[in-house]
Amino acid sequence: MHVFYAVIDNTIDLECLTLHKGVEYGCKLQLISKNTKTVNIKCITEVYYSDHLLKPLMAYVNDKLIQLDRKKLRHKIVYSIDLTLYDEVTNMLVCSNMDPDLIDRYYAKICLDFDNNVYTVKDKNYTNAVIEYPVVCNFRRYSESDSDSDVDDRAELHKRNNDSDSDDYT
């Protein structure tokens, strides 16, 4: 199973951006700010089965390809950028595939109005996109570390949940 989500300035969570079917990722963002503003954008892809590969992401701002910082962890890849908004409206596309049909018909379209703190999903398309603002932060989810202790914790939890004695009721 693949998961794709984004975090803006650690305060806005764009969740459930994964397509209902397939292994492509993407979303279209409309960023609105009348003043010059720098926003930190993190796009995260995760895989829950290690035998699946994560596809790389590309980003375009106002139709120009931009470079994302990429940090590969054990089960996820975090792409990030500090993007300075100069225009009143900045359009950003983050995607794993430049197929116009995917972009227009399948990826979510999201509007982030920083002037009025209004963040809306304009069109979910083939996703279940939702916005959480302000974020009630789950630090592990937004962390850019994937330490062995986190993996050990998940393994222990999995072991306890699959313990045959756990089905006994007394």
UniProtKB/Swiss-Prot annotation:
Region: Disordered, residue numbers: 145-170
Any one GO BP annotation for this protein: viral process
Basic and acidic residues: compositionally biased ranges: 152-163
Residue ranges of the TM segments: none
InterPro entries from the UniProt entry: Poxvirus_C7/F8A (IPR004967)
One Pfam family hit: Pox_C7_F8A
Family assignment from sequence similarity: Belongs to the poxviridae C7 protein family.
Reported function: Plays a role for multiplication of the virus in different cell types.
Entry protein name: Probable host range protein 2
Organism, scientific name: Cowpox virus (strain GRI-90 / Grishak) (CPV)
